Amino acid sequence: MLMLRRTAGAIPKPPKSKVYGFLRRFSVHPRTLSCHKLVLGIETSCDDTGAAVVDETGNVLGEALHSQTQVHLKTGGIVPPVAQQLHRENIQRIVEETLSACRITPSDLSAIATTIKPGLALSLGVGLSFSLQLVNQFKKPFIPIHHMEAHALTIRLTNKVEFPFLVLLISGGHCLLALVQGVSDFLLLGKSLDIAPGDMLDKVARRLSLIKHPECSTMSGGKAIEQLAKDGNRFHFTINPPMQNAKNCDFSFTGLQHITDKLITHKEKEEGIEKGQILSSAADIAAAVQHATACHLAKRTHRAILFCKQKNLLSPANAVLVVSGGVASNLYIRKALEIVANATQCTLLCPPPRLCTDNGIMIAWNGIERLRAGLGVLHDVEDIRYEPKCPLGVDISREVAEAAIKVPRLKMAL
């Protein structure tokens, strides 16, 4: 049985009354229900409210997603209490839409899977509280999901990928390099020592005031940087990738942010404009910081591949590198990683962009994987808790650093 620490976030016991009676009012169209196992996945770890039903063969029977992006763009970042309230306002509708699209009721489900770690505490609490009430009302098994494990395994829904494989998870909240040896068997090779790449790109976008740019006003920060960088010259400014002399697989993005912030301040003074106005060189700055980010990610990933092959953790041939998370949708960064994959005889695989960002499908699929393997399927949820902070797998990053693998220089012809 999966036991979680009692020091993690406490969830009040669901009320005995069947508060989700609305679920019994679904108009279920007559049809032949699949004999396959069905898992409802619920995702509320950050600022997206997602739900989906997936069967054991990987068919997505229904899904729904509510994004809070436009709300948080106006506030300059995610405000946890606001995210919590928006989850509360939308989770019932999202789950109802998902089940209606499948033409099933909760009684038809084999289990309910929900993200409980890691993430924003207030957001995680909404999803877990809602899920536990469904679990108790309909007497279904509960499958607690690790958000980053779900991202890592999403590729097995869309592609035939066998264990082991290497995964780079890059988003606004995480930057992790891990070897995936099984459904719940991960070796952590490296992680960000400070902030995540998506967070850094968002902060640079805010510093450049890209929300005021006509091409970028409705985009997230990272997407705005990618869009603007297409018109920029990355050679116009020199921004070097961080940690170039550290022979490990860890990452750092705070330095990139500070260097870029100083550059922006300098250019504002040079152009005689106030903070908050658009620089004429904004596209060049975006291109330079994006290139430095891509090179940093590529070099650490290159070292991870070499380490895994040296230690016989990956096959010398036919090795697979999976890149997932919101930043994985950046095509420039993906191209840099493709160069590394080609140089190391690896196959680079990325989930479709809509599955790279947070969604209910990946949670439901992770539930299916766990249900099939008999891992972490709970029938007693009395002690279940959410965990805002939670590591991924077994950390062997020190062993990677001790190997001190020198990475050959690659020409990043991007």
UniProtKB/Swiss-Prot annotation:
Modified residues (N6-acetyllysine): K74, K140, K203, K230, K299
Xref: CDD domains: ASKHA_NBD_OSGEPL1_QRI7_euk
Transit peptide (residue range): 1-29
Disulphide connectivity of cysteines: none
A single MF term (Gene Ontology): N(6)-L-threonylcarbamoyladenine synthase activity
Catalyzed chemical reaction(s): L-threonylcarbamoyladenylate + adenosine(37) in tRNA = N(6)-L-threonylcarbamoyladenosine(37) in tRNA + AMP + H(+)
Cofactor comment: Binds 1 divalent metal cation per subunit.
Pfam families per the UniProt record, alphabetical: TsaD
Gene Ontology CC: mitochondrion
Necessary cofactors: a divalent metal cation
Its EC number(s): 2.3.1.234
NCBIfam families documented for this protein: gcp_kae1 (TIGR00329)
Role, per record: Required for the formation of a threonylcarbamoyl group on adenosine at position 37 (t(6)A37) in mitochondrial tRNAs that read codons beginning with adenine. Probably involved in the transfer of the threonylcarbamoyl moiety of threonylcarbamoyl-AMP (TC-AMP) to the N6 group of A37. Involved in mitochondrial genome maintenance.
The protein's name in its UniProt record: tRNA N6-adenosine threonylcarbamoyltransferase, mitochondrial
Organism classification: Eukaryota, Metazoa, Chordata, Craniata, Vertebrata
Gene label: Osgepl1
